[in-house]
């Protein structure tokens, strides 16, 4: 079976959607599916099996910025690649976001699965409701990564949408070599890790204030960058290490090494895949008590969840995990089991079955192993 997975966001940049598309494609290939990824790239494709439609531009979207490719050359390149690849199935991630995924859907000549990642409010769904509903009807099957993403898609686009949660490449995180422990005043080598874009909805300012309230025998590793980086670094307390953008390999190593992983987001998270990655790495999690995280980590079972936007509560949650080895061990044990239940292997098997059912419904031949 030939499948082309299309991502609207730059595959050269870190992001939840990009990571899911690339990880799913890798795992599908392990199952014998011919899986090609198509999307914007700002430079050479990040790995084999990826085809670029050209560079991206940053546009404001859903409280963040999105690296999209909207120009005529990207549209032309998308159509050229589809003509050359001759896929049996398209798997379009965020299929209504302008760019290669929407272009492929409008071309309308290949059975398509659409996966919706966004939660909250998407203004285009509201303003252009009749148009986006008409375009969404071109999808043969619809999936969403969380109940919140499904609710958004079904409310504004109509039609049924089944939840297939994001997956995690468990072995990649579980078997990573831990990053060296940092030097701390008391010699404990304890570290708190934050990973994410430096923008208001990620709550990094809340974490910095919480860290200010902790004792100094720990280091706060901050990975990522964004529009608020300069302002945050200027007011950060001592003990913060600003890592900038890190590679996938370093991410896995730092997750393995961290004493605790912290996700202080305020909103806009439809599914906390980074929480799963921390659990797979064997690291306890402290996170905001928001819907996208509650679907992944249950309170006091796989994570300590605290009210979002409250630095006092966040400091208390971090202190509990840092100071209570029994609690940390219990979170790690439960988190490891939880991460395994979201394995990318399981997700790939479910999507392979969906592709087959879509082909059967559309009357297309089953071409496994023939191309």
Segments predicted by a language model, with ranges:
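Conserved donor-binding/catalytic core segment of Leloir-type glycosyltransferases
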Residues: 4, 180-212, 221
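Carbohydrate-associated surface elements
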Residues: 41, 148, 167
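Acidic anion/phosphate-binding donor-loop and adjacent secondary structure
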Residues: 151-154, 168-188, 231
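Nucleotide-activated donor-binding/catalytic signature segment of Leloir-type glycosyltransferases, i.e.
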Residues: 230-250
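Short alpha-helical donor nucleotide-sugar binding micro-motif in glycosyltransferases
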Residues: 245-246, 254-258
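Acidic donor-binding loop of glycosyltransferase active sites
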Residues: 256-270, 283
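Conserved acidic donor-binding segment of nucleotide-sugar-dependent glycosyltransferases
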Residues: 299-300, 304-311, 320-326
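A short, well-ordered alpha-helix in the C-terminal region of glycosyltransferases
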Residues: 327-341, 353
């Amino acid at each position: 079976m030939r499948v082309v997975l299309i991502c609207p966001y730059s595959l050269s940049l870190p992001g939840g959607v990009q990571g899911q598309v690339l990880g799913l494609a890798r795992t599908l290939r392990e199952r014998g599916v011919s899986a090609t990824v198509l999307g914007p790239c700002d430079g050479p494709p990040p790995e084999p099996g990826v085809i670029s439609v050209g560079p991206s531009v940053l546009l404001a979207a859903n409280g963040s910025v999105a690296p999209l490719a909207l120009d005529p050359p990207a549209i032309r390149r998308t159509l050229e690649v589809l003509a050359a690849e001759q896929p049996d199935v398209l798997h379009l991630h965020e299929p209504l976001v302008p760019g290669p995924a929407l272009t492929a859907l409008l071309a309308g000549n290949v059975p398509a699965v659409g996966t919706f990642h966004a939660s909250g409010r998407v203004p285009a769904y509201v303003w252009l409701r009749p148009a986006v509903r008409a375009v969404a009807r071109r999808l043969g099957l619809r999936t969403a990564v969380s109940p919140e993403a499904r609710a958004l898609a079904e409310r504004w686009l109509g039609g049924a949408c089944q939840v297939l949660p994001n997956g995690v490449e468990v072995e990649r995180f579980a078997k990573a070599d831990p990053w060296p422990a940092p030097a701390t005043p008391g010699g404990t080598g304890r570290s708190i890790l934050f990973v994410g874009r430096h923008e208001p909805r990620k709550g990094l300012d809340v974490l910095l204030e919480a860290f200010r309230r902790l004792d100094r025998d720990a280091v706060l590793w901050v990975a990522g960058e964004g529009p608020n980086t300069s302002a945050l670094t200027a007011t950060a307390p001592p003990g913060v290490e600003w890592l900038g953008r890190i590679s996938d390999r370093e991410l896995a190593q730092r997750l393995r090494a961290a004493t605790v992983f912290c996700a202080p987001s305020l909103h806009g998270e439809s599914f906390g895949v980074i929480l799963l990655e921390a659990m797979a790495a064997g690291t306890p999690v402290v996170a905001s008590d928001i819907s996208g995280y509650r679907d992944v980590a249950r309170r006091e079972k796989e994570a300590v969840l605290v009210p979002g936007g409250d630095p006092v509560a966040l400091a208390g949650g971090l202190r509990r995990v840092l100071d209570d080895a029994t609690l940390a061990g219990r979170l790690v044990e439960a988190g490891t089991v939880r991460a395994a239940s979201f394995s990318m292997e399981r997700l790939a098997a479910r999507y392979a079955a969906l592709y087959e059912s879509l082909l059967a419904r559309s009357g297309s031949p089953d071409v496994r192993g023939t191309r």
